[in-house]
Swiss-Prot record:
Top-level taxon of origin: Eukaryota
Keyword Ribosomal protein appears in the UniProt entry: no
InterPro entries attached to this UniProt entry: PP2-like (IPR025886), PP2-like/Lectin (IPR052147)
GO molecular function, one term: carbohydrate binding
Described purpose of this protein according to its UniProt entry: Binds chito-oligosaccherides. Has hemagglutinating activity towards rabbit erythrocytes.
Name of the featured protein: Lectin
Subunit record text: Homodimer; non-covalently linked.
Annotated site residues (Important for carbohydrate binding) in this chain: W102
Length: 209
């Protein structure tokens, strides 16, 4: 973090992050007000992302909502539907899988906006509807670092609870000072059998609990 006005810390590379801001926080009268806003959380890029600063971990955190993710066929109403939902006093959008065989969901974040030295966890936040089907085969989840190193695992959604939000962990990582700068890619993939009834809220990136 960067020290502002004595002992108050704000997030690493905050200026670059705030370029995507939906509301101009620089119009606020003081850094303390700015600090309050970033610790509470602020929306970026037309409410497709949310940034907040974790005071305890002194770490930047992000939620990449479904509109910020690359979801194959998501613009085709035969396969996906976009539903409004309320969160943090704002109307956002969640993607609902109607019927698809080719499940491909990808999120990206630049290492430059994450806090160095923090052990992060990335996880997709999803829900299975009561009528969900086609999830007998596990989904492949993958985390790919800028240097090309990968973490890969399989997650069985068949036994997950219905009608509640839950997290699919993609992996853990840490940004070291001097490490390769670039994109980290997170994905859920499953190209077998027809699937339906998955709601995708987004991808959360925050300190490992």
């Amino acid at each position: 973090g960067e020290l502002v006005g004595g002992e108050v810390k704000v997030g690493h590379n905050l200026e670059a992050i705030l370029k995507g801001l939906d509301v101009d926080v620089y119009s606020v009268p003081s850094f303390i007000k700015l600090y309050d806003q970033v610790t509470a959380g602020i929306f970026l890029n037309n409410r497709t992302k949310r940034y907040w600063f974790d005071k305890n971990a002194e770490s930047n955190c992000f939620m990449l909502y479904a509109r910020d993710l690359l979801i194959t066929w998501s613009q085709d109403k035969r396969y996906w539907r976009w539903n409004p939902f309320q969160e943090h006093g704002n109307t956002l959008e969640v993607a609902e899988l109607i019927d698809v065989c080719w499940l491909n969901i990808v999120g990206n974040i630049e290492t430059s906006v994450l806090s160095p030295g923090i052990s992060y966890e990335a996880a997709f936040e999803v829900m299975l509807t009561n009528s969900a089907s086609g999830w007998r085969i596990p989904v492949d989840v993958k985390l790919k670092m800028p240097d090309g190193s990968e973490q890969e695992s399989q997650v069985n959604l068949q036994d997950k609870p219905r009608g509640v939000w839950f997290f699919i962990s993609v992996g853990h990582f840490k940004i070291s000072v001097g490490e390769t700068i670039g994109n980290i890619e997170f994905s859920i993939v499953q190209h077998q059998e027809a699937k339906r009834g998955l709601l995708v809220k987004g991808l959360v990136i925050q300190p490992k609990q």
